[in-house]
Amino acid sequence: MTEEHIEEIINAIKELQEDTSIPKSIKLKLQKMIEILSENENTSIKINKTLHELEKIDNDNNTDSYIRTQLLNIASMLENA
């Protein structure tokens, strides 16, 4: 995965984070995902950690279908990178 792909994923997460309909608890988890992807670490480790955070959000009862769809798009970007 190149830095361009990581930046693209970070931008997608930031775009979702700016949505006013998203609960604060989910926004905090999205911020953690951005921090993980910004770390100086092996790319595959960053991807796995980020996917784990996505799973936590998906299991959250506050997550509505729109947010789940956006998270699936981000997960797809991570898995295809």
For every predicted segment, state its role.
Residues 1-81:
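Peripheral, non-catalytic segments of secretory and membrane proteins
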